[in-house]
Amino acid sequence: MSEPVNKVKQTQQQVDDVTNTMHIAVGKMLDNQQKVSELTDKSENMKQGAQQFKKKTNEIKRLMWCRNIKLTLIIIAVVVLLLVVIIVPIVLKFT
């Protein structure tokens, strides 16, 4: 009669072990879900930051391009003006 009682106790111990293991596994799963949720939020924030960064860099790129064109036009105008100032008196002198 002792043997069936031992088997019941042994089976109950196995059930308790499995239950404990499942509790631990469920706890870890919930922790992992929380971490995934946090990572998803951080990822979304980074995505928004990257989009804002890209928008700003495009604005700055456009602004710098305009400034570069203006500077180039000013340099060309100064060179043309200098050439006119130098060449016109020479041409007028020889005509």
Swiss-Prot record:
SUPFAM superfamilies cross-referenced by the UniProt entry: SNARE fusion complex
Entry's transmembrane regions: 71-91
Induction: Regulated by the srfA transcription factor.
GO cellular component labels: plasma membrane; SNARE complex; transport vesicle membrane
Cell location: Cytoplasmic vesicle, Secretory vesicle membrane
Keywords linked to the UniProt accession: Coiled coil, Cytoplasmic vesicle, Membrane, Transmembrane, Transmembrane helix
Primary location class: membrane
GO terms of biological process kind: hypotonic response; vesicle fusion
InterPro entries, sorted: Synaptobrevin-like, Synaptobrevin/VAMP, V_SNARE_CC
Protein family: Belongs to the synaptobrevin family.
Name of the protein this chain belongs to: Synaptobrevin-A
Gene coding for it: sybA
